[in-house]
Amino acid sequence: MYLNKINLFLVTNIFLIFFLSSYNDVKSEEVKIISGIAEVTDGDTIRIEGKKIRFFGIDAPEKKQQCKKPWLTISFISFSKDYPCGQISTDKLKKKINNKLLICKWTNKDRYKRYIAECFKDKTNINAWMVRNGYAVAYRKYSKKFVSQEIFAKKEKLGLWSGTFMMPWDYRKNN
């Protein structure tokens, strides 16, 4: 048990050194880092060591949110069926990062006291990965950073873009 904690500490610090050295465009005193084993809450929120982290610049469907997917098309008539897109978004994120080492670079906190962050698993930007695969959308109200990933997912009809859905912010407003 003690050796596992030492190994986790060493791996985290080595990863932090690599991470910080690869971001030489950011002054070290401005970089605020949270790192550790990720625990997925939903498609855009995680916990690391009890700290709640909301992914910067993206918005995933709510856990109970349903979306529509084409089911059958006959001539010019199309039938669709509901599917649990919010739960799928959460499950895909869990498969990718749950119980894995993450490094999150945060800038501020929101009104719910969550850290707003970009998170990385190895060299993969998880925020970008969620949007590029269609499990979340770019949250343009706060940032345009992930718009190109959204355009790609939409063009390729990935995830949410394979059917129709209500934008997460509209769903929250109506439910």
Regions found by a protein language model. Name each.
Residues Y2-N175:
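Small beta-barrel nucleic-acid-binding modules, primarily SNase/OB-fold domains
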